[in-house]
């Protein structure tokens, strides 16, 4: 009888499993110079050598519309990136790491019910493809910390982080980057800035998030009157924006910390213009990533960090919070901070954070780690150093795909524990595509229209208007106002039902203090470390130390400090 039950269970399990369907390259359509190569040791009779061409797998069948996992069996002599297209629309780019033997790379694609075409098209080209496998996608919920990484963050920063977390996966915050400040009058309404006005002119709505740059705040000319005025105007906009309920988002195009060159690009990316050859690794002790505090590089770096921190402290005094994306596009070989190894970059990022937060006392910023797709894991400074993981993606004009493959790559890289944002873009990702593809970015932010910028114009009026008037896109008009917004902490942002059981710490914990003391049935909200970082709903598996167990009793929050032996 037991054997029969086990057999039935096995049959039921097998019947519910989703098996991958394989599509061979030799049966696909090749174009642009790609060619078939007959060979042994592969899945079928050969493989496709794409060179500078493309491959299209026709007849890819999906039983129902939705998200599917796509595995590509490939070879590449060097790192390459190429486009993934589904039924003619761009689904994102795929990074193919160098490999001398056949290897797999996995991505996602949204398919329609019935027959589909999946294509790999040239961006860099020069890969070989044996086959692809397609199977239903297994989604996992996000579990994001209830508090920002900054210890003792300001009330404004906690509100901002909570707002991002509360809306992530449900709604996307609209943004716009600012460029030229010459048309903006110091102290005027931020809505009068040309880039902010651009959005209103196109859509009748203002962006909820406005990008600002410390572009002229460092370097040998930082104290020139025009440069200083540029930064002062950016700070003025941040103050007015926050007062109006919006979100300031800061980028820092950091110029040579030794003040030798008024540049942040390295020579190969300067297009004949001024460039810097500053090498921040000269600030390390030889053979390590430990800083030599007596080195010129270290002293120059720290002086610049302190200077930018002072602007944040000015905002902090006025109750203003913001988003900070330092050392952006990490791994891209065009800025001086990306010319060295991932380990060295991570040390630099940690220095920026530690100096600002622990030394200068900056407590009002939400921190962003912004790598290239290929470096998201290898350049990571550590999850305790950032709240948001973001990527910059510039699709072709009028390509409003969700870029789901990049979203899922970053979700997986963060183990579903970070807010994911599109921190720079050209055309906006259409809200319907984002929700259909389960790739709902926290915010998007087209680069500026001033300084002859073309990026906001890469979205047609109809798409601009339909998105900015969609309830799933947050505009400035939709913002609640920071004085009215209240923080609602829950253990995670998953779509699963919360645990309402009465949870107790494990038997190896000792209660130290409880505030306030309230009698009644308690429901565990979460376990937090002493810096307020959410760790889960049980102390099981946690190392020795002090933890805060947060419970809800009669509608009130009760915090108990436990020591785990």
PLM region spans:
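N-terminal module-boundary/linker segments of secreted carbohydrate-active enzymes
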Residues: 135-215, 220-231, 431-433, 483-492
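Substrate-binding cleft of secreted/luminal carbohydrate-active enzymes
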Residues: 177, 418-492
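Alpha-helical scaffolding within the catalytic cores
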Residues: 190-199, 232-235, 307-311, 370-381, ...
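Substrate-binding cleft of extracellular glycoside hydrolase catalytic domains
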Residues: 215, 219-351, 358, 362
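C-terminal outer-membrane/trafficking sorting elements
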Residues: 504-565
